[in-house]
Amino acid sequence: MPEITTKPRTKVKPQTERPKLYKVILINDDFTPREFVVTVLKGEFKLSEDQAHRIMITAHRRGVCVVAVFTKDVAETKATRATDAGKAKGYPLLFTTEPEE
């Protein structure tokens, strides 16, 4: 009679990695009106008036400010849409993204 071997069953949960997060960064410029920057921050990033104003002032004083952190696709989409809002009005408003450490 042939010998039957069985393998023990092991349950292994597949490990899913968390998606990398990216920072959306506001770059200060000397031409875009502050009120417009606040409006874009409120509209695209759903910030309160106070939050948007603080981010705008921080970027004005330091040259840059992290607006928010998202997954890569969301961060790039929001940065592009916010930058495009400035371009549509003729302003050099610029948002960039970079990986969060």
Swiss-Prot record:
The record's annotation in InterPro entries points to: ClpS, ClpS_core, Ribosomal_bL12_C/ClpS-like
**An example Gene Ontology biological process:** proteolysis
Q: Pfam families under this entry?
A: ClpS (PF02617)
Q: Which domain of life is it from?
A: Bacteria
Q: What residues form the membrane-spanning segments?
A: none
Q: What does this protein do?
A: Involved in the modulation of the specificity of the ClpAP-mediated ATP-dependent protein degradation.
Q: How does it assemble?
A: Binds to the N-terminal domain of the chaperone ClpA.
Instruction: Kindly give the HAMAP family that the UniProt entry links to this protein.
Output: ClpS
The record's comment on protein family reads: Belongs to the ClpS family.
What is this protein's record name?
Answer: ATP-dependent Clp protease adapter protein ClpS 2
